[in-house]
Amino acid sequence: MAEADTERRPHIPVLLRPLLAAVAPVEGTWLDGTFGAGGYARGLLEAGADRVIGVDRDPLALKMASGWAGDYGDRLRLVAGTFSQLDSHAGAPLDGVVLDLGVSSMQLDLAERGFSFQKDGPLDMRMSQEGESAADLVNTASEESLADILYHYGEERASRRIARAIVEARAAAPITRTLALAEIVARCLPRPKPGQMHPATRSFQAIRIAVNAEFSELVEGLEAAERALRPGGRLAVVTFHSLEDRIVKRFLQLRSGGEGQGNRYAPETRAYAPRFTLPLRRAISPDEAELAENPRARSARLRVGVRTDAPAGKVDPQALGTPLIPKKGRR
């Protein structure tokens, strides 16, 4: 029932109109690396793209798209996979890449996927529905590792207090439900005032990022987009929180000419020809009309880069400000 309800509910892609305007003209072959409910892919096809490759690691997203994807014939190809390997999914140089980061509305709305702290469901949070779940992490990670994850991936100042409460709670019984975890976190923090975010927001974000390795996926995906785009090809990335937005912002800054500025910590830094140009002076945020239509868009930011003909290369995740968890063992 939940799946059917989500399929009927119209999907509102965040910042679609400004994205299409920023990457115009839309033509040739595009890759939507976070296909989800297909809103960006449809928008690109209707705006003039000859072909769109839709990539998603969530098998449910691709299953739900099977009912309408055939309407576009061979103009839309769906691929099960991650956007960190988008260049291998493309098979040929691309005219554009779109990435809509984080958890999708579909995943949030389905309680059984375990992403929401407002709906009771199994503590899962796996986008691919494979591998270690959030329950596995919460019930087996050491208190120190949990605190590191909450602090570095969620910017949660009360990380140690929350980690201690989790360890104490799981000693009595395994934590297997989303609302159970949300209540443990909420008891560690002051009651929010009207209009403030739910106290479990940062903790759920952090655990989700850890379960899905979202930051390494993002860095590798940006590198893959650089390899896959032809000269003049567009990269458009929509972010939803400051940590991932910082990574995208620094990537585009460095790849558009910020490299080669050596310092006493990296005196051997070489200068490279810019791999991207930046058509936007700053990130685009939703306007009031979009926020009224889709309140979930409030934290969204759109950044765009245009590929040059300079050779692609590797990037240092630390140079992008990627949060790193100290390597001292999880268990």
Swiss-Prot record:
Cellular localization per UniProt? Cytoplasm
> One Pfam family this chain carries?
Methyltransf_5
- Is rRNA processing set as a keyword in this record? yes
Q: Where is this region: Disordered?
A: 289-331
Database matches in CDD domains? AdoMet_MTases
Keyword Cytoplasm set for record: yes
Checking InterPro entries in the record gives: RsmH, SAM-dep_MeTrfase_MraW_recog, SAM-dependent_MTases_sf
Entry binding sites for S-adenosyl-L-methionine: 38-40, 56, 83, 100, 107
> Under the cellular component aspect of Gene Ontology, which terms does the record hold?
cytoplasm
Please give one Gene Ontology molecular function term for this protein: rRNA (cytosine-N4-)-methyltransferase activity
Which EC number(s) are documented for this chain? 2.1.1.199
**Catalytically driven reaction(s):** cytidine(1402) in 16S rRNA + S-adenosyl-L-methionine = N(4)-methylcytidine(1402) in 16S rRNA + S-adenosyl-L-homocysteine + H(+)
Query: Keywords in UniProt for this one?
Result: Cytoplasm, Methyltransferase, rRNA processing, S-adenosyl-L-methionine, Transferase
Query: Which family is this sequence assigned to?
Result: Belongs to the methyltransferase superfamily. RsmH family.
Q: What is this protein called?
A: Ribosomal RNA small subunit methyltransferase H
Its organism's taxonomic lineage begins at: Bacteria, Pseudomonadati, Pseudomonadota, Alphaproteobacteria, Rhodobacterales
Question: Quick one: which gene encodes this?
Answer: rsmH
